[in-house]
Structure formats: structure tokens, C-alpha cells
């Protein structure tokens, strides 16, 4: 599923959804207790997200 928004309630994600932000693609993997985001399949930008606030803050930081 392709998502064109960056600020989205993270509980709405399912495994292998994608976020597009300023021309970059981020995959969002959802697990019961945490969320993972990484850019273009690369581990360099791989992060763990545990709340909606952290998710939205991450995309604010990379603007």
C-alpha cells in the first residue's frame, strides 16, 4: 500500500506499508509492541518507533 502522508496514526499501519516524504520512500513494518521504519530498504536509516509521537517527530526531523 502506498501512503502519501507522513503524519499518520501509526496503529493504522500494517506490515510493509510505505510512506513517501520529500521524494524518499520509507517502509513501515508494524509489530505488536514497536514499529520499524527504514528508507529504501537500507539499514542506515533504520529506526524503531514506539508511539505516534515518535513517528511524527521522526518525519519532522528529516524535513
Q: Can you name each region flagged by the protein language model?
A:
Residues 14-58:
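Acidic, low-complexity, intrinsically disordered interaction modules
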Residues 1-3, 60-63:
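Short intrinsically disordered terminal tails
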Residues 1-11:
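SH3-family beta-barrel domains
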Amino acid at each position: 500500500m502506498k501512503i502519501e502522508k507522513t503524519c499518520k496514526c501509526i496503529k493504522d499501519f500494517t506490515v510493509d506499508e510505505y510512506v513517501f516524504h520529500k521524494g524518499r520512500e520509507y517502509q513501515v513494518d508494524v509489530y505488536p509492541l514497536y514499529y520499524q521504519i527504514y528508507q529504501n530498504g537500507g539499514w542506515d536509516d533504520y529506526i524503531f518507533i514506539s508511539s505516534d509521537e515518535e513517528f511524527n517527530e521522526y518525519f519532522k526531523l528529516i524535513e
